[in-house]
Amino acid sequence: MSYNSFGHLFRVTTWGESHGPAIGCVVDGVPPRIPLSEADIQPFLDRRRPGQSRFTTQRREPDIVRILSGVHGGVTTGTPVALQIENTDQRSQDYANIADRFRPGHADIAYHWKYGVRDPRGGGRSSARETATRVAAGAIARKILGERVRIRGALVQMGRHAIDRARFDWDEVDRNAFFCPDPEAAKAWAEELDAVRKAGSSLGAVVEVVAEGISPGLGAPVYAKLDADLAAAMMSINAVKGVEIGDGFAAAALRGEENADEMRMNEDGTVRFLANHAGGVLGGISTGQPVIVRFAVKPTSSILTPVHSVDSDGDEVDIQTKGRHDPCVGIRAVPVGEAMMACVLADQLLLHRAQCGETGAGRLPLAKK
């Protein structure tokens, strides 16, 4: 197995390289009779598309998606849905000077050691270009989840500077180039990233993804936990080096009573939580609260600043990477994180239906004895 697929029942296989003729994915396990067209997928690709501001790569890709199979008469047929996105703006010559050199912090040397051969053009298979296919698959996953489920992502930290949570406003996310929910932070980030970009360097970031409208009961103990699948999905995104669910690492500093998501009864007999430190998941199973995931994205490895490295002959060299690269790859990771959240939730929904049917006990009020 080459590990180019993820998911259990809703299973996505991606293919293609950064500078190949096209990239794409095959989405298996899509239920039949779901309305689907390219128009349902394209808006999500447009949010991730490169070249939309000076803060992202200037590679100009239209990212137009084509559905090749699995849809007839405007609805899914239950067979694999194949999607293709053409690459139209490659500049492979930009990578000629690093064909035999390994970029520090990049997958170059790891791919070389594993396979004995690699595609240096734009990073080949390890390029963030691959994530466009995940966004396309995520659009299909959203169709399975339905309109009741809302998935939103935001950049909550760039470099050392985090947002002010008191100013968190989801309406601000699509009003700036950073998917930032804090307008003041967005202004400060613009100044800082301009300086970093002009210096030929890059910054890391933290992305937060929140899913609301999730029914209780998704996920299963012990090896199909919802949070385990979410962590694996987010960690599979290029440049991601850490993931947390809910309070995550901050929970280690809390006492037990502080970390507890206390509960009370509503008048209709349903349960309400007084907090959400767990991020909507307990015991690997959704609680009905918002599912909250954050992931850390390292600074872009391809930078103009000269750094020390080695080449394939074993000589020590200095390397300066030309080409068009994101000064902060975390920005365009926001729609990718949303897509991975959607894929995992759709997968877990199908697994839940397979075991428990359309409804589970979590939808019912607690009966008083």
UniProtKB/Swiss-Prot annotation:
Q: Name one GO biological process term.
A: chorismate biosynthetic process
Does Transcription appear among the keywords? Answer: no
Q: Which reaction does it catalyse?
A: 5-O-(1-carboxyvinyl)-3-phosphoshikimate = chorismate + phosphate
Q: Which cofactor does it need?
A: FMNH2
> Which enzyme class, named as a word?
lyase
Q: Keywords on this record?
A: Amino-acid biosynthesis, Aromatic amino acid biosynthesis, FAD, Flavoprotein, FMN, Lyase, NADP
Which Gene Ontology terms cover its molecular function?
A: chorismate synthase activity; FMN binding
User: E.C. number, please?
Assistant: 4.2.3.5
For binding FMN, which residues are annotated in this chain's numbering? 125-127, 238-239, 283, 298-302, 324
Give the InterPro entries listed for this entry. Answer: Chorismate_synth, Chorismate_synth_AroC_sf, Chorismate_synthase_CS
This protein's pathway: Metabolic intermediate biosynthesis; chorismate biosynthesis; chorismate from D-erythrose 4-phosphate and phosphoenolpyruvate: step 7/7
Instruction: Quote a single Gene Ontology cellular component term.
Output: cytosol
The cofactor note reads: Reduced FMN (FMNH(2)).
Which residues of the sequence carry a binding annotation for NADP(+)?
48, 54
Question: What Pfam families does its record include?
Answer: Chorismate_synt
Q: Which family does it belong to?
A: Belongs to the chorismate synthase family.
Its subunit composition reads:
Homotetramer.
> What does this chain do?
This reaction introduces a second double bond into the aromatic ring system.
UniProt-listed NCBIfam families: aroC (TIGR00033), PRK05382.1 (NF003793)
Stated name of the protein: Chorismate synthase
Q: What is the lineage of its organism?
A: Bacteria, Pseudomonadati, Pseudomonadota, Alphaproteobacteria, Acetobacterales
GN (gene name): aroC
